[in-house]
Amino acid sequence: YMMGKYSKAAVLLAELISIMKGTDKAEESLFMVGMCYYGMGDNETASHYFTTYYNSYPRGVYAEEARFYTGKSLYMAVPEPRLDQTATVKAIKELQLFLEYYPQSDYSETVHNMLYDLQNNLAQKEYETAKLYYNLGPYTGNFNYASTSPDANANNYESCVITAQNALKEYPYCIQREEFAILIL
């Protein structure tokens, strides 16, 4: 582990966990397996091991670090804003839980910065959605539906404004604030 051979260390430490179950060595091994996967860049597996650690050892020696690295691993696994943001929401929840459990932690500032970035990801997704409505403009889709529907006068500009207004309410400190205001006008 100390030499950076994380894949070998992960295999050996995983075996130690089952052999040493119930001892301090199993606790340390479980945390170190998470760190191995984190070091290899396998963020989802790392977050799984860190979650297992703090659920198994809530008052363990590495409980604070495990919660932090769970959130950080999920943060690192977040997709770009144009994709599904379920992972972003999961990372936000985990980081907020960390702040609830450890408000005075040395990691607090880092966690706040990660939360800010994740909120901006969600705001960017909303901006792209509003921009799509704006670009669609008065397009109503199916001609037959448009001529027979009582909502035929409704258009995508209204959807753009509503999406932008909702995004400003939900993410008031986002970096896209000015762009949302332009779309609303």
Residue ranges of predicted features:
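Acidic, polar-rich low-complexity tracts and alpha-helical solenoid repeat scaffolds
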Residues: 1-185
